[in-house]
């Protein structure tokens, strides 16, 4: 295994040297990094490899990633296309700063029913935790308003609330090194303790 590993590393280093001269395949992330992928959520980079090392002309360098919530799944993302699809997971400091700003993050409110689901989709695909907070706040407010009117939460609202909440809590859980199930209470406790009278 070690021989194979060192051979793979040598190939990558050699190709990166050539690639850097050509301005392609710049490796931005490292093995062991936690990154956020739209819709999927947080993944750990397990390897950086060529899928076909024998074909230097047509082969691409890939990140091999495993979602933190499904380590059996493998995701391959081309290094050359990673900027638009990946970002580093929040640091612990960034996570606390986000929690601190939650009360001030504007609600992504829209009165256009036809555009609402599209807005939800865009927020989920944006790979931006603030966008997730914005639609979570919006859907929560809509739910409370509908309950006051004797109506149930819509299926679309319920689905995207669950998706957004899962993605947000997953990232905050990894950043804060806490179980995802504890994040909601962590947020509530922090905001309650830091309220300004």
Annotated model-derived regions:
Residues 7-23:
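Short, positively charged and aromatic/hydrophobic N-terminal segments
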Residues 52-62:
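Short, solvent-exposed secondary-structure boundary/capping segments
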Residues 41-51:
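Short beta-strand-centered aromatic/proline hotspots
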Residues 80-197:
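Charge/polar-rich, low-complexity and marginally structured segments
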Residues 64-66, 70-80:
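A short macromolecule-binding patch
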Residues 1-5:
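Short, small-residue-biased leader/transition segments that mark boundaries at the very start
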